[in-house]
Amino acid sequence: MAAALAASENPNVQVFLLERQARVGRKLGATGNGRCNLSNLHALEGGYHGDDVSFSRYALEQFDPQKTLAYFADLGLYTVAEASGRVYPYSDQANSVVDILRFALDRPNIRLITDFEVSKVKRENDGFTLVAQKESVHCDRLIVACGGLAGTKLGGTMAGYKLLRGFGHKCTKLRPTLVQLKSGWSAIASLKGVRANCHAILLCDGKKQNESTGEIQFTDYGLSGPVIFEISRDACASSGNWECQLDFLPEWTEQMLKEQLMKRRGTNLTCEDLLTGILHNRLGRVLTQATGIQGRTLIASLNEGDLDAICHSVKAFRVSVTEPMGMDSAQVTAGGIVTNEFDPTTMESRIVPGLYACGEVLDVDGDCGGYNLQWAWSSGRLAGLSAGKDM
């Protein structure tokens, strides 16, 4: 949509927006748990990944977060930025973003065609012909803005990758990112629904691969929440013993926690209540029992070694990681069409003149927190403006 709107700014251009589904913006309407984290004020400071992280720089600078928010304001969308830099629609509804874009598409030189699933693309001397079941569309220039494979239930597809590979472009390995992690830990189901703030470190054979601080949520299959999404990109990317080390009191040292727990040794309480008031009750009991200390044990009977073990459990608890959830659960696709085959200042193919690509289909993915949508807006607008220039 961003590319179509940008291209249509040239009144001499007729834009066809071809949508495979019955309506536009279905995936966008489901982002951010229905809130749509549409940008991040810190997007120019980093937070992007791919074989060439510098590729995204030009597009992001040309249409940075401030310009993006001003653009949406002109369209009629009121936004609010959190202290973290995450930007949301003031309505707190993702559909507000979809609707504003849908309204903007109502322009004389934009024709939206839904239920248009491309079966074939033919390269011709004067452009491209896209063939679908009911009709064909001919264009002088073609922008591939199909998104990635992530979120298959909402429309994630291989279509863009296949189309571009058909024109000779190469694609890196695709894998899910910003996704939940599965665990083989037998006690994980007992914590289903528990949320906690923690510092999480992704480990492979004991070596740190990634880390983040934020909210975690336990599920019946493993780990979820923003902090897990942040570290999930590299999970199980190679063979080895993968674990997630969790610090449930990142602002405390083990000694600080131990001093608090020692105060409870003068009571008649059992270890089931040792961490009450500090952590979620269910989480506290599981962390205590993981040391081998039973819940009915009197706190007064704990020795120094017992307290040290419990404190270490709270500060450095390790959960096995077997694999990330699949593409149907992922928010974003890591990997994509190789970027050195495109001009970063126009998003045009270096292989096929008149062919452009933008967004998730390329080998660019961002951190959790609005980075990926900012890349979509920035790269889409650059591709649209470039393709929409007078020929």
Which residues are covered by each model-predicted region?
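An anion/pyrophosphate-binding glycine-rich loop and adjacent beta-alpha core
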Residues: 22-24, 29-30, 38-45, 170-175, ...
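Glycine-rich FAD pyrophosphate-binding loop
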Residues: 8-33
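Core beta-strand elements of the Rossmann-like FAD/NAD(P) dinucleotide-binding domain
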Residues: 113, 132-141, 211-214
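Glycine-rich active-site loop/strand segments that organize a redox cofactor
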Residues: 33-81
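A glycine-rich dinucleotide-binding beta-alpha-beta segment and adjacent secondary-structure elements
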Residues: 114, 285-365
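Short hydrophobic core segments
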Residues: 18, 118, 137-156, 164-165, ...
